[in-house]
């Protein structure tokens, strides 16, 4: 045992050195990020990331570290560097931005994000407790250059109507709803009338360290000018553009279905009669990977996840597709089952 204690102490020292090196790596990444910010160069450069990944794999081959482990370490340090660089201020021409619902989770995130880029941020929110930015009325907020609607889906259309009525034709207006169907008619009508409207969906939550390397969907609602200006605001992110009518169908799979799979998986485990400790003790590699995602989902905001399931009308089709897929897993013949998995592998390529 004393010998084991000595070896474990040595491992602890090695771990400290590793974390020290990661910290030093972050310091260098920050300096690189500052240089990128000066020229508005992109934070994420896929070709450079591939070089880093291969560098780790090659180094691992010489030190007895498997390629899979080397790749995962590379991704961890690269992702850390991206967040370090993504948090750096990238100042833009200052504009006044009012966030309706700015004291909620994503409202706070957006307020800090825009303020860090040099914009003048105010919020309009009935809940003012702990507000970090000036709180204004909707009428005053509507005088801003940019107005962001960050409210629950259930009241968003009414808020949008009020904002359109109170604001000038020059104001850029967009929502960040996870479900677009309730506001599409009003957004399209406003777009046809020449208003600068679009619809945005950051594909991450308020726990995100930065927007860099993360997806932001910009939906066109008839005003290219508004969509272009929204894209500039989020230009450190990976921008995907689509028509607003396409959004909910895609979201039904990337949000509704992916959430439902993990929630249903966890529910099946809860009702299995096993404790989590018992199943972890005999876990397979796949089970460990699946539960790593499912435990994060289980600890998310249940009210928000309920809303995502219920408020997107396209979710029913996605969940029926899932039900059919589960049925196929249960009933297909051997050859059909193998063919199904082969098709899945091809789809992911």
Which residues make up each language-model segment?
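An accessory alpha-helical subdomain
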Residues: 240-349
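Active-site regions of enzymes building and remodeling cell-envelope glycoconjugates
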Residues: 130-139, 215, 236-239
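Hydrophobic/small residue at the entry helix of a nucleotide-binding pocket
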Residues: 105-106
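Conserved N-terminal Rossmann-fold NAD(P)-binding element of oxidoreductases
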Residues: 98-101
């Amino acid at each position: 045992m004393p010998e084991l204690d000595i070896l474990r102490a040595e491992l602890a020292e090695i771990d400290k050195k590793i974390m020290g090196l990661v910290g030093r790596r972050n310091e260098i990444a920050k300096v690189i990020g500052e240089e990128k910010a000066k020229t508005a160069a992109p934070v994420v450069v896929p070709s450079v990331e591939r070089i880093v990944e291969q560098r780790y794999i090659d180094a691992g081959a010489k030190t007895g570290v498997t390629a899979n482990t080397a790749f995962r370490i590379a991704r961890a340090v690269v992702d850390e560097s991206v967040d370090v660089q993504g948090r750096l201020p990238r100042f833009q021409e200052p504009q006044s931005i009012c966030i309706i619902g700015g004291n909620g989770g994503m409202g706070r995130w957006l307020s800090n994000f825009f303020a860090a880029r040099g914009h003048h941020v105010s919020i309009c929110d009935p809940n003012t407790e702990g507000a970090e930015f000036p709180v204004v009325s909707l009428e005053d907020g509507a005088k801003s250059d940019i107005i962001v609607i960050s409210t629950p889906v259930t009241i968003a259309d009414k808020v949008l109507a009020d904002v359109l009525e109170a604001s000038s034709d020059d104001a850029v207006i967009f929502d960040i709803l996870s479900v677009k169907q309730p506001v599409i008619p009003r957004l399209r009508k406003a777009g046809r009338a020449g208003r600068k409207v679009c619809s945005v969906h950051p594909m991450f939550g308020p726990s995100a360290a930065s927007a860099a390397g993360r997806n932001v969907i910009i939906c066109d609602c008839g005003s290219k000018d508004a969509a272009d200006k929204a894209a500039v605001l989020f230009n450190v992110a990976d921008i995907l553009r689509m028509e607003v009518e396409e959004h909910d169908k895609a979201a039904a799979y990337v949000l509704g279905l992916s959430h439902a799979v993990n929630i249903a998986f966890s529910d099946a485990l809860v009702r299995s009669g096993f404790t989590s400790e018992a199943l972890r003790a005999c876990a397979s590699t796949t089970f460990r990977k699946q539960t790593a995602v499912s435990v994060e989902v289980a600890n998310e905001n249940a009210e928000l996840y309920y809303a995502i399931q219920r408020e997107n009308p396209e979710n029913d089709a996605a969940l029926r597709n899932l039900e059919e897929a589960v049925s196929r897993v249960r009933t297909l013949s051997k050859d059909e089952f193998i063919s199904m998995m082969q098709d899945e592998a091809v789809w992911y390529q």
